Amino acid sequence: MLGIITFIIIFGILVIVHEFGHFYFAKKSGILVREFAIGMGPKIFSHVDQGGTLYTLRMLPLGGYVRMAGWGDDKTEIKTGTPASLTLNEQGFVKRINLSQSKLDPTSLPMHVTGYDLEDQLSITGLVLEETKTYKVAHDATIVEEDGTEIRIAPLDVQYQNASIGGRLITNFAGPMNNFILGIVVFILLVFLQGGMPDFSSNHVRVQENGAAAKAGLRDNDQIVAINGYKVNSWNDLTEAVNLATRDLGPSQTIKVTYKSHQRLKTVAVKPQKHAKTYTIGVKASLKTGFKDKLLGGLELAWSGAFTILNALKGLITGFSLNKLGGPVAMYDMSNQAAQNGLESVLSLMAMLSINLGIFNLIPIPALDGGKILMNIIEAIRRKPIKQETEAYITLAGVAIMVVLMIAVTWNDIMRVFF
C-alpha cells in the first residue's frame, strides 16, 4: 500500500509540475487553455474555472496534457437552422450562446442560427421573431453545447498557432524546464536533509554505528592518515588503501588504521567486515555542511544525474532494447522499493525521474515537446509557419509511434516485474 501511495504522489507531482509549465506560459503568451489534465482516459473529476479552463483528473497514470485552443479539432460547428438562446451583456454583445435545452437563461433571446463567425468577425446571425438579425459576440463569450458542456469561444488571437513564435517556443519548453527545476530543488532539499554534501577531497570520516571502525574506537570527524602503511589524504585514497590492505586478508585478520583524533595520532587494529566480495571498515566520507556547499552539492547531484541519463540515452540509441526503457509499471516498482528505504530514497528517486522526464521530453520526436520545439525552430528559420495540416500529420505519426512504444514498454515491464 505504501508503494502505491508513493507512486501516486511522485507521479502526480511530476505531471503537475510539467504540465503547469505549459499551462502558465501558454496563459502568459495569450493562448486560451481548454483543459489541464492529469492522467489519461476516462474522467474521474472535473472542474471549470471562470476563465473557461477545464481541470480534469483521469483514470490512467500515463502522463497528462494541456489542451490549447487551435489544437486539433477545436472548432464548434453550428448547423444552419439550429435553435439557440443568446444572452447579451450590458453593451448588447452576445456573452453566451446556448445550443442545449438545459442551463436556460430566462432573459435570453431565442434565435435560429443561419450564420456565424466566432474566430475573426465575432458575430452570429439568425432569425429572431422571423426577422434576420446579426449580433456582435463578446471576445470571451461561451457556448453551451448540445450535451450541456460549456466552453469559451476561441478567437484567432487566443489560438496556439497565432501566438508569437517566442511564446510558442517557451510554452513548449516550459514543461521540461519545470522538471529540471524540480529535480534541482529536490536534490538540494535532499542534501540539506542529509546534513551536507560528502567531502571526497578530505580524509575526515563519519563513523557508522556498530561498524568495524566504531568498535576500534574511531569517532565522527576523526582523520584517517594511513591504512597498513598506505597514506590516506582523501576518500579515494582511503577506499584504495582498504582494497589493497584487504586483498589477501584471511578470516579474523585485522588491518592497522592510523588516525588523528583531537590532534593526537593513534594506531588501532580494525577487523574489516565483508559485504559481497568487498571489505569495508564502517566509515563514510565527512560532510561539507556550509549553506553554499549544500546548494552546490544539490546542483552537483542534479548535473551528475542528468549526465547519467544522457549516457543511458546514448546507449539506447546505439543498442536499442526494451529492457533499457521503463514505463508506469517500472516507475511503480521503483517507487515501491524507494518507499521501503525511507524518505531520502523517495526524494532521490523523484529528483532523478523529474530530470529524466525533462530530458526525455526534449527528444525531437513529434508528439513530444522536443518535436514541437524543433518545428518552432524550423518555422523561425523559414520565417513562415508550417501548414497546420502538415504539422497535424507529423504529430499524429509521432503519437502513433509513442503509443506503440508505450504498449511494448508496459508489457515488458509487467513481465519483468510480476513474472
UniProtKB/Swiss-Prot annotation:
It is a multi-pass membrane protein. InterPro entries: PDZ (IPR001478), PDZ_sf (IPR036034), Pept_M50_Zn (IPR004387), Peptidase_M50 (IPR008915). Belongs to the peptidase M50B family. SUPFAM superfamilies: PDZ domain-like (SSF50156). Its main location: membrane. Its cofactor is Zn(2+). One of its GO terms (cellular component) is plasma membrane. It holds the Pfam family Peptidase_M50. It comes from Streptococcus pyogenes serotype M3 (strain ATCC BAA-595 / MGAS315). Zn(2+) binds at residues 18, 22. Coiled coil: none annotated. Residues 175-274 form the PDZ domain. It is found in: Cell membrane. The chain crosses the membrane at residues 169-191, 301-323, 343-365, 392-411. It comes from the Bacteria. GO terms for molecular function: metal ion binding; metalloendopeptidase activity. This is Putative zinc metalloprotease SpyM3_1689. GO terms for biological process: proteolysis. Keywords: Cell membrane, Hydrolase, Membrane, Metal-binding, Metalloprotease, Protease, Transmembrane, Transmembrane helix, Zinc. Its EC number is 3.4.24.-. The active site is at residue 19.
